[in-house]
Structure formats: structure tokens, C-alpha cells
Amino acid sequence: MTIDNLAFEKALYDKGYTYICGVDEAGRGPLAGPVVAAAVIFEKGFYHEDINDSKTLSAKKRETLFELIKQHALAIGVSVVNHEVIDKINILEAARHAMEDAISKLKIKPQYALTDHMDIKGIPYTSIKHGDQLSISIAAASIIAKVTRDKLMVDYDEVYPQYGFKDHKGYGTRKHLEALNLYGVSPIHRKTFAPVAKLLKQ
């Protein structure tokens, strides 16, 4: 069964909305680095069959689509919320803040938002479970957020090469956990996340 990932947008166009943004984040799970959110508005009816949930795409494909989305989107907003804020307000609230901030950075004010399973303030919205698979706007936002965050983690890898951030992007892989135990906690690790918090208590 093929999924019509324009169905949510079409329903809103039929209700008279013109500017609909999809919003998603990347980086809720990692032990290090920021959470990044993106908001994307396409022209009414825009479709591209390859734009899908960023997690299902190869890094190379994501980067190709990142450029395509930048070319075709009417507006893109991106927000980066760092590890210190994540530790202060928790990852769920940090992700929510990043999504709301990404919307505020759009050069066109959206009339409605579609989010990937997140409640937000300041705009009428629909929270969609597995939204990055069901809405092209959310899928595009997931790609923008993921590619942006991955690039940031590659940059961090140059500052802290011993942790291998360019490979695992901060996720808790075996290699990352081994590096954590060997080298200790870096300045960009999330101190409230269990494996890091455990190390800090030792």
C-alpha cells in the first residue's frame, strides 16, 4: 500500500490554508550535541516522491534531498538548541522549544503547522504520529534537521576527535561508550543522560 504523504496538506488546502509548515527535529536520542529542529513550507501542491522520513534514507540521499528542498521550499526555518539547554529543561522541552523557534524563523508566516508527534504553542497545528512518513512537509523538515545536525557533529569531531562524533553523531554506540569510558565526558555531552550521568558520579 502506498501512502499519500500529501493527504494532510491537501485536507488543509481544501479548508483554505495556503501556508502550511511541516516541523520535525533530529537529535533527541544522542548522548552529545544539540537537538536541531526545522520547519519547511512548500508551494501548494508541491510533491517529490523521494522526500520521505530522513531515518529511511542514506546519508548521501539525505544530502541530495537537502539541496533539493532548499531549492523548492518557499521558506525554511532552523533552530539549534545546545546540550546545556537540554540538560537544564530536559530533552522533550528542548525539542519542543527548537520546533517552535524553527517556525518563528520562517520568512513566511505559516497559517498552520504539521508536527511529528509534538504539541506546540503559538500556531494552529496537528500532531501526527509517524508524521515524517505521512506528510511530505514533515519529511522535508526531518531531512533538513538531520543533515544540519550531522554537519554540526562532524564539526565537533574536529574539536573532539577521540570520541568519533563524525561516525555516530553522538548516539550511544559501542564505540562512543568505549570512548566515553576511556576519555571521560566532553564539554558537549549531555550530563543528564544516563550513561554520561553515571560516569560523572564515579
From Swiss-Prot:
GO terms for cellular component: cytoplasm; ribonuclease H2 complex. It catalyses: Endonucleolytic cleavage to 5'-phosphomonoester. GO terms for biological process: DNA replication, removal of RNA primer; mismatch repair. It is an enzyme of class 3 (hydrolase). A divalent metal cation binds at D24, E25, D116. GO terms for molecular function: manganese ion binding; RNA binding; RNA-DNA hybrid ribonuclease activity. Manganese or magnesium. Binds 1 divalent metal ion per monomer in the absence of substrate. May bind a second metal ion after substrate binding. Its cofactor is Mn(2+); Mg(2+). It is found in: Cytoplasm. Its EC number is 3.1.26.4. Its main location: cytoplasm. Keywords: Cytoplasm, Endonuclease, Hydrolase, Manganese, Metal-binding, Nuclease. Residues 18-202 form the RNase H type-2 domain. It holds the Pfam family RNase_HII. HAMAP family: RNase_HII_B. Endonuclease that specifically degrades the RNA of RNA-DNA hybrids. PANTHER family: RIBONUCLEASE H2 SUBUNIT A, RIBONUCLEASE HII. Belongs to the RNase HII family. This is Ribonuclease HII. The lineage of its organism: Bacteria, Bacillati, Mycoplasmatota, Mollicutes, Acholeplasmatales.
